[in-house]
Regions:
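Generic hydrophobic, amphipathic alpha-helix propensity
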Residues: 1-3, 19, 44-48, 112
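Short hydrophobic clusters on alpha-helical segments that form packing/core surfaces
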Residues: 1-6, 74, 168
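Helix-turn-helix
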Residues: 5-39, 43
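Amphipathic alpha-helical linker/stalk segments
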Residues: 42-70, 79, 117
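Amphipathic alpha-helical segments used for helix-helix packing
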Residues: 45, 78-99
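Amphipathic alpha-helical packing segments from all-alpha helical-bundle domains
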Residues: 79-80, 96-122, 131-135, 159
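Hydrophobic alpha-helical segments that form the core
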Residues: 126-148, 158-168
Length: 174
């Protein structure tokens, strides 16, 4: 319900009353549990980040398999919640207090950066800031979503994980 209302009305335009109505609960219940709209948003983002954290995104020693796994997970995230993520990114310049909401996803990105750094240290990837490498790897997924291809099958067909990893490695593998 949080995602639907905020995507439809924007963060500033969404009210807890609208969110409660969409969720089929009393607004007072939302206030008791979350306190405010930002905490509702934080809870939703944390749930997605925990889902990402539980998807076995750890170093395995197999560079292509790890990169493909990262691409698949982000692709699934964009299919499931891309519209919310894009809305959140567009709202950050206008609502800087929302930056707190992104703490868990930022921690997940740093974790993935440590995996890429390890491959760099092993000489399997060129040296560059790990978050730059991560952005280069998953950037096409975000770009596809920004261009309006959030419809699940289109996004999945537009960005084929193994092909994306091969293209990424053409310029970055040692």
């Amino acid at each position: 319900a949080v995602a639907d209302v905020i995507v439809e009305r924007g963060y500033a335009g969404a009210t807890t009353k609208q969110i409660a109505a969409k969720a089929g609960v009393n607004e007072v219940t939302l206030f008791r549990r979350f306190g405010n709209k930002k905490n509702l948003m934080r809870s939703m983002v944390q749930q997605e980040a925990m889902r990402l954290g539980g998807m076995d995104l750890d170093y395995s020693g197999d560079l292509e398999a790890d990169l493909t796994n990262i691409v698949r997970v982000y692709q699934q995230l964009m299919v499931r919640r891309g519209h919310v993520l894009l809305m959140l990114l567009s709202e950050l310049p206008k609502q800087p207090d929302l930056l707190e909401v992104t703490e868990m996803p930022q921690a997940q990105a740093r974790h993935l950066g440590t995996i890429l750094r390890r491959y760099q240290e092993e000489g399997k990837l060129v040296e560059e800031p790990p978050l730059v490498a991560l952005s280069s790897l998953i950037g096409p997924i975000f770009m596809s979503a920004m261009l309006g291809s959030l419809e699940a099958t289109l996004l999945q067909n537009l960005v084929e994980p193994q092909q994306l990893v091969k293209q990424f490695l053409q310029g970055r593998a040692n």
